[in-house]
């Protein structure tokens, strides 16, 4: 079934859908059915693509994700905008779909070095309900490509829920390929607090330099959201702690209370299976904002059985599964 847009009588735009095996009825061309699009609205104009306006993004996000598979109703504006800051969003190259002055769709894009290449990250793509299945998501993506190429961006990356098959197919048509599976887990705070203490391990604040010194200890490459440069993107919003054994740095954690986001948990290979990771997780409970009931560990490489088993032993349970998808620009 094809879809598209065409102009009807002055001031009215319609969406058409071609049904190859269906007749349109008397008086209507057989090749297409014309479905009037929001005719009840006055002064309807053809949506235009312009840069996303930061002050309109939150309202548009909440509308676009009001029926999303994961409940977004509790997302706060301050937290959403901080996440965009963490991901180095550039609103000037993030295309927005506007119906008049109203933002009804968007692809919000962050740019940073990741895996040895300047990379664009799709922080969020969303459309208000009346603007879906009309090809706008593809148009937004295509609109962003020239500016990204001018910036020297070599790759585009995104994450998508595995259950969102229509989105996966749409991304594949745009040239994206599945790079890996990502697991998202969640634990009750009470479970973290109840973790057993680890004797002989001193957990205390650490510097960004100390945290970066263990970067090579990572058993898998972090996703864009959890990249190590995040520690520099929002330094005042991240609590970095180190686990020390005999004065030697054995592991680090990085957690953002404002986002309730576990960014990094690393243990030196020489100190694994000694309770270092457990001590760091237990310590994170001291940073949690008041009223926080859950802590999530997001975007763990699906092939990292050891890491997944560790989180499982600490009381974490499956939340959702995602795919990381990439394409060259």
What is each PLM-predicted segment?
Residues 13-16, 37:
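Tryptophan (W) side chains
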Residues 21-24, 45-60, 198-215:
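A short beta-loop-alpha structural element at the N-terminal edge
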Residues 61, 65, 70-94, 98-100, ...:
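Active-site rim helix/loop that mediates acceptor-substrate recognition in acyltransferases
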Residues 96, 102-111, 119-121, 126, ...:
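Conserved beta-strand in the GNAT
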Residues 127, 133-146, 172-173, 273-286:
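Conserved acetyl-CoA-binding loop-helix of GNAT-fold acetyltransferases
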Residues 134, 138, 162-180, 278, ...:
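Conserved active-site alpha-helix within GNAT-family acetyltransferase domains
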Residues 148-159, 290-301:
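Conserved GNAT acetyl-CoA-binding A-motif
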Residues 159-161, 177-190, 317-328:
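Conserved catalytic-core motifs of GNAT/GCN5-like acyltransferases
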């Amino acid at each position: 079934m094809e879809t598209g847009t065409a102009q009807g009588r002055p001031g009215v735009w319609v969406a058409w859908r071609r049904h190859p095996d269906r007749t349109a009825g008397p008086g209507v061309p057989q090749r297409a059915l014309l479905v009037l699009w929001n005719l009840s609205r006055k002064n309807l104009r053809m949506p235009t693509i312009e840069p996303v306006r930061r002050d309109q993004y939150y309202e548009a996000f909440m509308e676009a994700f009001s029926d999303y598979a994961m409940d977004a109703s509790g997302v706060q504006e301050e937290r959403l905008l901080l996440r965009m800051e963490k991901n180095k969003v550039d609103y000037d190259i993030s295309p927005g779909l506007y119906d008049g002055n109203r933002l009804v769709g968007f692809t919000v894009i962050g740019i940073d070095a990741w895996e040895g290449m300047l990379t664009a990250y799709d922080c969020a793509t969303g459309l208000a309900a009346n603007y879906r299945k009309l090809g706008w998501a593809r148009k937004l993506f295509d609109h962003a490509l020239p500016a990204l190429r001018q910036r020297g961006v070599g790759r585009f990356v995104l994450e998508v829920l595995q259950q969102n098959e229509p989105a996966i197919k749409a991304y594949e048509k745009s040239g994206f390929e599945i790079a890996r599976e990502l697991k998202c887990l969640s634990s009750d705070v009470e479970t973290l607090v109840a973790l057993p203490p680890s004797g002989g391990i001193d957990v205390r604040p650490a510097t960004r330099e100390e945290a970066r010194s263990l970067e090579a200890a990572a058993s898998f490459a972090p996703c864009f959201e959890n990249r190590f440069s995040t520690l520099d993107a929002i330094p005042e919003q991240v609590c970095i702690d180190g686990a020390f054994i005999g004065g030697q740095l054995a592991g680090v954690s990085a957690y953002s209370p404002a986002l309730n986001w576990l960014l990094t948990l690393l243990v030196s290979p020489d100190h694994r299976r000694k309770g270092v990771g457990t001590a760091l997780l237990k310590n994170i409970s001291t940073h949690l904002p008041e009223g926080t009931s859950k802590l999530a560990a997001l975007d763990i490489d699906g092939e990292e059985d050891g890491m997944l088993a560790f989180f499982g032993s600490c009381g974490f349970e499956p939340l959702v599964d995602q795919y990381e998808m990439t394409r060259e620009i």
